[in-house]
């Protein structure tokens, strides 16, 4: 039985895992289970959690099931929290993951004749936020000239840390940073993003 205030990170992560399994072997049971869970996310307004795994899920499941409700969920998950993400002083890497996944999904919506669903969302503000986060998160990168001041520079050089949590380095934070930056770089290479940061209104 779930606690009333339990976080939902693992729910989204589990569904994302099912969708990646489906991508590998095309066994319909994975997609059916993911869709059933995603319907639950929609019923219970999970988008209000603004979680990066939910953005990953929405981006992934709409590749196979282009349900407008799924797209709408993904858009709300990001845009309802966009000004907060833009202005946040922490270097949490999941913000970049969330916004980049939303951008990827919105690009597909443009090509799948779903522009009508995009009218209520300021896509330019999403791009500004992505660029701001990509630049800002470098405040949490252990450049050699920073790592040298720590006890074991070789161990942390080139990794990522969370400054407001005592310069903590954890493998999941490093993974989230790499994941976000790889997807960000991919969009830049495709010419789908500008590298210039601007102010979100």
Where are these regions (language model features)?
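Hydrophobic core segments within long, regular secondary-structure runs in both alpha-
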Residues: 12-15, 19, 28-42, 55, ...
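Residue-level signature of the C-terminal ends
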Residues: 21-24, 44, 61-64, 84, ...
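Short linear functional motifs in flexible/disordered or boundary regions
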Residues: 26, 33, 46, 53, ...
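Short, surface-exposed, charged/polar-biased interaction segments
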Residues: 35, 55-58, 62, 75, ...
């Amino acid at each position: 039985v779930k606690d009333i205030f339990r976080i939902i990170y693992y729910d989204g992560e589990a569904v994302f895992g099912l969708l990646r399994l489906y991508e590998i072997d095309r066994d319909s049971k994975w997609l059916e289970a993911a869709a059933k869970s995603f319907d639950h996310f929609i019923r219970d307004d999970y988008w209000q959690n603004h979680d990066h795994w939910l953005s990953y899920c929405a981006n992934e499941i709409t590749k196979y099931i282009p349900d407008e409700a799924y797209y709408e969920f993904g858009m709300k998950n990001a845009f309802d929290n966009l000004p907060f993400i833009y202005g946040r002083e922490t270097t949490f890497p999941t913000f970049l993951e969330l916004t980049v996944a939303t951008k990827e999904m919105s690009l597909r919506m443009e090509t799948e004749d779903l522009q009508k669903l995009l009218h209520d969302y300021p896509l330019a503000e999403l791009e500004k936020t992505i660029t701001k986060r990509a630049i800002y998160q470098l405040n949490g990168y252990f450049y050699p000239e920073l790592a040298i001041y720590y006890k074991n520079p070789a161990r942390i050089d080139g990794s990522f840390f969370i400054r407001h949590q005592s310069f903590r380095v954890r493998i999941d934070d490093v993974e989230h940073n790499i994941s976000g930056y790889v997807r960000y770089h991919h969009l830049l290479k495709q010419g789908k993003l500008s590298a210039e940061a601007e102010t979100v209104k």
